[in-house]
Amino acid sequence: MNRKPVASGKKYGGMQRNLWRPRVCCNSSSVSLRYFSPYHSVVNSHQDSLGARTLGVRTLAWVSLLTVGGFAACAKQAGQTGASSNGGAMARRGTPAIPTTAPGQFPQGWHLPAGQTAAFAQQAMAVSNSPEASKASVEILKAGGNAVDAAVALGFALAVTWPEAGNIGGGGYMVIHMADGRSATLDYREVAPALATRNMYLDASGNLTDKSVDGHLSVGVPGAIAGLAEALKKYGTLPLSRVMQPAIRLARNGFVVDSGLGRSIAGGATRLRKWEGGKLFAPDGVAVKTGTLFKQPDLARTLQAIADGGARAFYEGWIADSLVAELKRGGGIITKADLAKYTPKWRTPVITKYRDYSLVAMPPSSSGGVTMTEALNILEQYPKLPTYGSTAYFHVVASAFQRAFIDRNAKLADPDFVKVPMDLLTSKKYAKALRATIDDKRATPTKELEPKLEAAAREGSHTTHYSVVDSQGNAVATTTTLNNSWGSGVWVRGAGFMLNDEMDDFAAQPGKANMYGLVQLEQNKIEPGKRMLSAMSPTIVLDQNGNVLLVVGAAGGPTIITGTAQVILNVLDNHMNISDAMRAPRVHHQALPDSITFETGGIAASVLDSLRKMGHGMKQQAALTNVNAIMRVKGGWEGVPEPRRWGGAFGY
């Protein structure tokens, strides 16, 4: 790979910033360019996903996107550009739509192993954990579909190309903003089956078993197919059979396993071998490897049946028979009546003003929108946040998260079963009162704020988020999950898909932690037909004129809320461009455990010492959250897959 150091640069915001000097080379099979990348200006030396080495603030990278299924072409040919964990390209740099300044230097040694690159597109963009799924979404956009059509296509494609979390056997949430000003939120979260009981996961001594996280009894009634079909019906423009074609093709003809999926399968192989799905993902006990052509004929048959017969083909036909038979085989309790009864729900969006911007977020049964809104409202009480990276900054941000999570765990649940004080939790007056409880000199123990909670230590985090925008200015933020990585582990034989273990997101034992360490009270107890509380936080940020500025969301259990919020803070308060906003080190506080979790190397040693002296417990973790985002810039859109993991951003 050819690369030379940048010969010159200019000072920008007190830091050395690189000048973009693209040289585009086009032919019928590729689009490639040389560029000086400003995205590496605050990152110390590391190897990025393209193999280019960042040296301080000076980088020259040579990238080339070869044609994959006819997707790459020159900008003048309206071709697709993109970036992914396996390489990518950027047609040209866009100027941010809002003023940005260089953030303070990140701690020395801070680096992100995946080293994702951003993609720029003039008209439309899709970002997800799977390059193949993102490209499937762009195929629909280029065929004349809108953002909802493309989001539905992406959702089905993820069931093929990112099966640890992308799914048809789970559920999720979708936030939609149309260019005409309409906003909508769709709840297609799983529900507890009719035979579910309050204490179904407790043993004879009243202790919590692992049956809520593993095996047939952990499965909630899936909502994914009903949700995707409902979104398409109300806001899409293309038929279901058309938007499902890319997913069906990927399942039937196969696709080459990329490094992200290869690692995912390898990481889950031991668990997968316990179940029927191991025959597909680990034939003869050996995990499918990166570079393998991977076909899923049973899943292709299932998807084709849904494309031909609509969502009811999943909930009433042979697929439903196969699902129920598999669950009965292992002691599960979902019936065909449970499946036939499932209905996704349109809910009133959580819309709040933050600074000069508007946030459109998900209401309960997701806790994400309300909890994030409460935290941001608290932080808005500071006319200006402390400098990013300082002791004061991490103290106030973590303290806001702590208070919002206390309310999340004590007050939020399925609104069809529990009266949720939405007006209180999202009010500026309430936020002002909570801000007054933050001591700027010391940490406040959670027990002082809420004595009722008790903690236990269980952790985990696997979900997937995707963001889509189209040429008309419509936008979709969708988060979907099986809960744990590879869900319950239960494989529907003959149908080719994995089922969720979402029942663990109920408070199976109120006051005790679930798999994610979240402590919840009676309002989230198990009840038949009830949706379990979730942390998923798909969010769309609108500018002062009501136009889409940012489409964002994340995976990562409870860190979804704090990770999504921090990317928003980095853009709106810390004035970072979207790539820096994604790269910036993150922290997390969920009330219990009563500590700040921080990314290894992400906080300067002196700041860590100061936070400990203030009374904060400090716990390090290799990486926090898996965010995928799109931001409007002058002349188009920039899409950034999570730099801590892998994914793909593609557009045209």
Where are each of the predicted segments found?
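Internal maturation/activation junctions in enzymes
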Residues: 103-104, 382-482, 491-495, 502, ...
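Bacterial N-terminal signal peptides that target proteins for export
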Residues: 19-20, 33-38, 42-61
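Cysteine-centered motifs
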Residues: 25-26
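Noncatalytic scaffold domains of N-terminal-nucleophile
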Residues: 87-135, 139, 147-309, 314-316, ...
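Bacterial N-terminal signal peptides
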Residues: 58-70
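Extended C-terminal subregions enriched in glycine
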Residues: 530-531, 564-565, 573-622
